[in-house]
Amino acid sequence: MYEYLDRRYALALYEVAEENNKVDEYLKDLKEVVNIIKNSEDICKILKHPEINTSRKKEIFTELFKDKVDDKILSFLLVLIEKDRILYLEEKLKEMEKIYLEKNNMILANVKTVIPLLKEEREELIEKLGNKYNKKIILEEEIDKSIIGGVYVRVGDDVLDGTLSTRLKDIKKMMLKRE
């Protein structure tokens, strides 16, 4: 529902990062801030607490991140607090990462297998996907025992499901239809 808004915030920060030649630094800093927020119950409680006013929340964030992140990122965080969107910072980070990939002619491919891909398999998969999408492929691998065997690949909205678990489900459906 708020993806459009997340994208706008991310694009604004990305443009500032580009102007300052600090895109990688901003992405790294945002990831760290997201991790700190996600892993700190205290920060989450402060951000959600209705009796702690916005000014106090901004003061706390300024104290926490003043010398740890770029001033422009801190300003961005304070705007998100002001607009009551700071708890959705991770979504803005994801959108910013998407923008980074788009601007650098890259695309993310999620791959699930039961065992890790061999170096040759990984290289072949990257090459084939690169040819298909005409972009540099960033492979994100995941081990998933539930697929039993085969490979599951997701690139954007495209899915290639060559897993044994899916084939078995399809066979089961066919057999149940015949009964």
UniProtKB/Swiss-Prot annotation:
Out of the domains of life, which is the source?
Bacteria
**Any Gene Ontology CC annotation:** plasma membrane
The cross-references to InterPro entries, in alphabetical order and at most eight, read: ATP_synth_OSCP/delta_N_sf (IPR026015), ATPase_OSCP/d_CS (IPR020781), ATPase_OSCP/dsu (IPR000711)
Please report the record's description of how this protein sits within the membrane. Answer: Peripheral membrane protein
Q: Which residues cross the membrane?
A: none
Q: Which SUPFAM superfamilies match?
A: N-terminal domain of the delta subunit of the F1F0-ATP synthase (SSF47928), V-type ATPase subunit E-like (SSF160527)
Name where it's found: Cell membrane
Q: Which GO terms describe its molecular function?
A: proton-transporting ATP synthase activity, rotational mechanism
The alphabetical list of record keywords is: ATP synthesis, Cell membrane, CF(1), Hydrogen ion transport, Ion transport, Membrane, Transport
Which family is annotated? Belongs to the ATPase delta chain family.
Which NCBIfam families does this entry report, sorted A to Z?
ATP_synt_delta (TIGR01145), PRK05758.2-4 (NF004403)
Record note on quaternary structure: F-type ATPases have 2 components, F(1) - the catalytic core - and F(0) - the membrane proton channel. F(1) has five subunits: alpha(3), beta(3), gamma(1), delta(1), epsilon(1). F(0) has three main subunits: a(1), b(2) and c(10-14). The alpha and beta chains form an alternating ring which encloses part of the gamma chain. F(1) is attached to F(0) by a central stalk formed by the gamma and epsilon chains, while a peripheral stalk is formed by the delta and b chains.
Q: What does this protein do?
A: F(1)F(0) ATP synthase produces ATP from ADP in the presence of a proton or sodium gradient. F-type ATPases consist of two structural domains, F(1) containing the extramembraneous catalytic core and F(0) containing the membrane proton channel, linked together by a central stalk and a peripheral stalk. During catalysis, ATP synthesis in the catalytic domain of F(1) is coupled via a rotary mechanism of the central stalk subunits to proton translocation. This protein is part of the stalk that links CF(0) to CF(1). It either transmits conformational changes from CF(0) to CF(1) or is implicated in proton conduction.
**Protein name listed in UniProt:** ATP synthase subunit delta
What gene name is listed for this protein? Answer: atpH
